[in-house]
Amino acid sequence: MKKTILITGCSSGIGLDAARGMRDRGWRVFAACRQQRDCDRMRAEGFDSPLIDYTKPDTIAAGLDQVLTATGGTLDALFNNGAHGLPG
């Protein structure tokens, strides 16, 4: 069975590169993005892509539920990369 990882902040930069790299290494990657259009783009690349926006707690809960439902309640790794490039 493939190992699973949830990576936040996959719209661009480090998160996007990490998602592609982990997929290339055989992991099942849940590539979370803040905007629906980015999730759609990631899905077109073959990723599972939950919508998770750290400023909207309901998306965090829904996104995590989506991931845990898809994996049977387990996750091997988390890379909390989201919003590292945002000021504030």
What kind of region is each of these model predictions?
Residues 8, 75-83:
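Rossmann-fold scaffold of SDR-type NAD(P)-dependent oxidoreductases
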Residues 11-12:
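Conserved glycine-rich cofactor-binding loop
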Residues 25-40:
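Conserved glycine-rich Rossmann-like NAD(P)H-binding loop of the short-chain dehydrogenase/reductase
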Residues 45-58:
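Rossmann-fold cofactor-recognition segment
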Residues 55-70:
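Conserved Rossmann-fold cofactor-binding substructure of NAD(P)-dependent oxidoreductases
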